[in-house]
Each structure stands twice: as structure tokens, then as C-alpha cells.
Amino acid sequence: MADLVPVLTIDGPSGVGKGTVSKIVAARLGWHYLDSGALYRAVAVAADWTAVDVSDTTALVKCAFDTCVNFAKCADGEMRVLVNAIDATDVLRMETTGVLASTIAAISEVRAALKERQQMFRRTPGLVADGRDMGTVIFPDAQYKVFLTAKAEERAQRRYKQLMKKGVSVMLGALLEEIRARDARDACRSVAPLKPADDALLIDSTCMEVDEVVAQVLALVTD
């Protein structure tokens, strides 16, 4: 039964390293990996491609149901995301896509449409689920729960370095403002607001290296 499959949820705001840590932990454990944020970004991209009005909830919900999302691992180990059979990985990573996804994610009907799809990732031997409400809404019965945090300034700095490496010119101050605005949207939305589960392990990654965070998370599962 699916509910007997172990699940590790790693929640937290943007830029705390959820994705990086989750992928490493999933690989070490040999478990499946769910990037829930990619699903919302995929819906955002599909909505943009088909000119869906984000204020039209009915159209957005239909888009969420109709959008086909597949994760394909390349020979180099990198995960590519296909949206309706089109490789949209690079588009999904754009800041504008993230902002649109955050707006869409605040709509309860869209979250409901994607809930079952996320739960279907729960397969043997186990699942590492990365998101904002994995431990509180999607997998409230998960055996292991982590909530990652980090100061907004540090998260902006990390994102700035990532974008600079890719040759994307951006202002650090603008990134910081965007992160704070997204935090406010995520924490204040009426449906599935961003918050740690009562039984989650809290980890502040502000002054930590990735391997240190990974070690703490793995210890939760293996000890």
C-alpha cells in the first residue's frame, strides 16, 4: 500500500537549498524525488503558452488538469522537465516563471487539482518530496519531515551567484525584494500557507554548507 511507503518531506521558502539537498538525499537513499515546485511552474508555463488569463480560475484549473508533466534524467544525470512533451527546463527556472507560479499556487482550486498528482509519486522504496506544503498538506503522515530556513539576504546572494554563473544579469537588491515578496505571499495565503509541520525538524541553512545540511537530513532518516 502506498501509505506504507516511507516519505521524507523537505519544505521551506525559495532559495534555502531544498532542491539541491533533496536531490542529493534522494540519490543517497535510492528513493524517488518529487520537485513539487516544478509542477506549479509547469502549469505557469503551460498557462503562458496558451494565453490563459491567470485571473480566470476555471481556465487555470483546466490547465492544471490538462498539462502533462514528465521528468526525464539525461545521461549526465541532470533532470529535464517536459511540459506537454516540450523541454521547458530552462523556462521553468526563469524568475518570471517563479513569480507566476507563486501567484497560481495561491489559488486553492489549482492546489487541489495538483494534490493527487503529487501523491502519486509515493512509490517504493521511498520518496523525498521537496516543496512548501509537503509535510503539512500533501504528505501529513510522512515519517520524516524537515523544514529548511535561511535569512532572506543569504538566499538572495545564493540566487544572485547562480544567475551570474549562467550569464544572467540581475540586481541583487531586486532579487532580495522579490524573495521577500514571495515569502509574504507564501506565508499569508489562505490555502496551505508556508509553515513548518508541527513534527518537522527545523534547519537554518544560513551559515551551513550543503553537505552539512545533507548530513543532518540523512541522520534523521537513518539513525
UniProtKB/Swiss-Prot annotation:
<keyword id="KW-0067">ATP-binding</keyword>
<dbReference type="InterPro" id="IPR003136">
    <property type="entry name" value="Cytidylate_kin"/>
</dbReference>
<dbReference type="GO" id="GO:0036430">
    <property type="term" value="F:CMP kinase activity"/>
</dbReference>
<dbReference type="InterPro" id="IPR011994">
    <property type="entry name" value="Cytidylate_kinase_dom"/>
</dbReference>
<dbReference type="GO" id="GO:0005737">
    <property type="term" value="C:cytoplasm"/>
</dbReference>
<dbReference type="GO" id="GO:0036431">
    <property type="term" value="F:dCMP kinase activity"/>
</dbReference>
<keyword id="KW-0547">Nucleotide-binding</keyword>
<dbReference type="GO" id="GO:0005524">
    <property type="term" value="F:ATP binding"/>
</dbReference>
<keyword id="KW-0808">Transferase</keyword>
<dbReference type="Pfam" id="PF02224">
    <property type="entry name" value="Cytidylate_kin"/>
</dbReference>
<keyword id="KW-0963">Cytoplasm</keyword>
<feature type="binding site">
    <location>
        <begin position="12"/>
        <end position="20"/>
    </location>
    <ligand>
        <name>ATP</name>
    </ligand>
</feature>
<dbReference type="GO" id="GO:0006220">
    <property type="term" value="P:pyrimidine nucleotide metabolic process"/>
</dbReference>
<comment type="similarity">
    <text>Belongs to the cytidylate kinase family. Type 1 subfamily.</text>
</comment>
<dbReference type="InterPro" id="IPR027417">
    <property type="entry name" value="P-loop_NTPase"/>
</dbReference>
<keyword id="KW-0418">Kinase</keyword>
<protein>
    <recommendedName>
        <fullName>Cytidylate kinase</fullName>
        <ecNumber>2.7.4.25</ecNumber>
    </recommendedName>
</protein>
